[in-house]
């Protein structure tokens, strides 16, 4: 069983999945069934029943195949999730690289800085809270998702490439632990 973590940055608190209430789980599930949110994440809305969605998420979390968090605002209201997944090398080896994913399911929170703060909290976890800190965190976002790119850049990510697909272009971004540490020392994180 993984350790319970709680990481805060600014107005955002991240809590590991076993800390989510049943109501939080229901909201979480609703985000994955929402067409617009799925589109922004390059996915299709989940068709799983609630019980299976929750089981799959907890199974991955408990197997340490990903680090998953519920995202809460300053009033402790659930508003989304952050994950570090696609761990390399794959556990049980000690991972050094992960991919970051974020979903803000509450539309009234979009464009208000919560994403940037959640990403900064996830980077603090990845680079300073894990017993064996990651060396690099990467992500992919759509070229047309300028709001996400701005949030990721504000959290310290840099663009490292573009990936042309048949129907869209992905922006590849990453940050190393060394870059993150330098930002913390300069006081910009």
Q: What is each model feature region?
A:
Residues 26-27, 39, 182:
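Short, solvent-exposed alpha-helical surface patches in well-structured domains
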Residues 1-22, 33-34, 68, 75-189:
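Acyl-donor (CoA/ACP) binding surface of acyl/acetyltransferases
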Residues 22-30, 50, 54, 58:
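An amphipathic alpha-helix signature
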Residues 36-56:
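Conserved GNAT-fold acetyl-CoA-binding loop/helix
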Residues 50-51, 61-64, 171-173:
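Short, intrinsically disordered/low-complexity patches at protein termini
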Residues 30-34, 43, 59, 154:
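Residues within well-ordered alpha-helical secondary structure of globular protein domains
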Residues 57-70:
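A short helix-loop-beta-strand connector motif used in the catalytic cores of GNAT acetyltransferases and
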């Amino acid at each position: 069983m993984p350790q319970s973590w709680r990481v805060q940055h600014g107005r955002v608190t991240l809590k590991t999945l076993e800390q989510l209430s049943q109501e939080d789980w229901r909201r979480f599930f609703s985000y994955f069934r929402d067409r617009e949110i799925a589109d922004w994440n390059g996915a299709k809305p989940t068709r799983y029943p609630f019980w299976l969605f929750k089981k799959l998420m907890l199974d991955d979390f408990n197997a340490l195949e990903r680090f998953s968090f519920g995202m809460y605002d300053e009033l402790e209201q659930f508003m989304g999730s952050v994950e570090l997944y696609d761990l390399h090398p794959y556990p049980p080896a000690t991972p050094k690289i992960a991919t970051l994913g974020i979903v803000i399911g509450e539309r009234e929170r979009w464009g208000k800085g919560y994403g940037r703060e959640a990403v900064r909290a996830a980077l603090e976890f990845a680079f300073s809270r894990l017993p064996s800190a990651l060396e690099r965190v990467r992500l992919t976002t759509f070229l047309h998702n300028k709001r996400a790119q701005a949030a990721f850049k504000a959290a310290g990510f840099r663009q490292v490439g573009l990936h042309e697909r048949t129907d869209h272009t992905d922006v590849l971004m990453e940050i190393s632990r060394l870059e993150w540490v330098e930002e913390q020392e300069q006081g910009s994180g």
